[in-house]
């Protein structure tokens, strides 16, 4: 088995766009990714998205870990931040895939781009490209499937998934970039005064986070 990536073969390629209102100068996709709560990630593609987290690779490169269903496969995406800019990120993962027939692997390249159209009117582009590994090619051959057949199935599944997540990602990035809404203080608190050192900060996702 080999995890060598076959960049000469394309397993799937999906490009989906969504327009959204967002303060363009405050958009920071890299920071949004690094601070994305797992439940917000789930809201961006229900029920496909399962969990998300942030870590670093051995060399210190930031990584985003995403667990999601693509078609019938449970995919563990281990994205390295290859490009991390406010309006553009390129994430590259050697991903583990659990299929009904067992485990295999693919490379996934995820590109996130926000462009300003006019004022706060923006366009978000979600691009996902997948290449097979040698392991993947051996896996499908062993199970009686040709590469064109596997690519057709993956293209359909990836396209459907991207169409689901793209507008929801755009809205989530826009909420993160929006200025915080001032909180109204209650006149009377039936539970008594707050404990010292405990306060709430507004979350861009509509939740009050204790700090």
Q: Where are each of the predicted segments found?
A:
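Leucine-biased recognition of intrinsically disordered, low-complexity hydrophobic segments
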Residues: 191, 196, 207-209
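Beta-strand/loop substructures that line and gate deep hydrophobic ligand-binding cavities in soluble
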Residues: 96-160
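Serine residues within intrinsically disordered or low-complexity segments
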Residues: 200-203
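Short acidic, gly/pro-rich beta-turn/loop elements at beta-sheet edges
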Residues: 28, 73-77, 134-138
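Glycine-rich portal/gate segments that line the openings of hydrophobic small-molecule binding cavities
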Residues: 50-103
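A short, structured loop/turn motif at beta-sheet edges
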Residues: 23-26, 83-88, 113-123
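Hydrophobic ligand-binding cavity/cleft-lining segments
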Residues: 1-61
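Long, compositionally biased interface segments
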Residues: 146-192
């Amino acid at each position: 088995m080999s995890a060598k990536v076959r960049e000469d073969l394309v397993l799937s390629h999906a490009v989906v766009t969504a327009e959204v209102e967002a303060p363009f100068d405050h958009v920071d996709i890299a920071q949004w990714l690094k601070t994305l709560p797992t439940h917000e990630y789930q809201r961006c593609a229900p029920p496909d998205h399962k969990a998300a987290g942030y870590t670093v690779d051995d060399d210190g490169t930031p990584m985003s870990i995403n667990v999601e269903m693509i078609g019938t496969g449970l995919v563990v995406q281990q994205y390295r931040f290859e490009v991390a800019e406010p309006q553009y990120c390129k994430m590259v993962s050697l991903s583990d895939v659990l299929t009904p027939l067992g485990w295999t692997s693919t490379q996934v390249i995820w590109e996130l781009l926000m462009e300003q159209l006019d004022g706060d009117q923006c366009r978000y582009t979600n691009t996902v490209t997948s290449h097979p590994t040698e392991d993947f090619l051996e896996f499908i051959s062993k199970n009686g499937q040709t590469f064109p057949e596997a690519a057709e199935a993956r293209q359909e599944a990836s396209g459907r998934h991207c169409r689901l997540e793209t507008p929801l990602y755009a809205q989530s990035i826009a909420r993160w970039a929006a200025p915080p809404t001032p909180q109204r203080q209650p006149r009377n608190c039936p539970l008594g005064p707050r404990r010292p050192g405990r306060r709430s900060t507004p979350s861009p996702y509509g939740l009050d986070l204790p700090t």
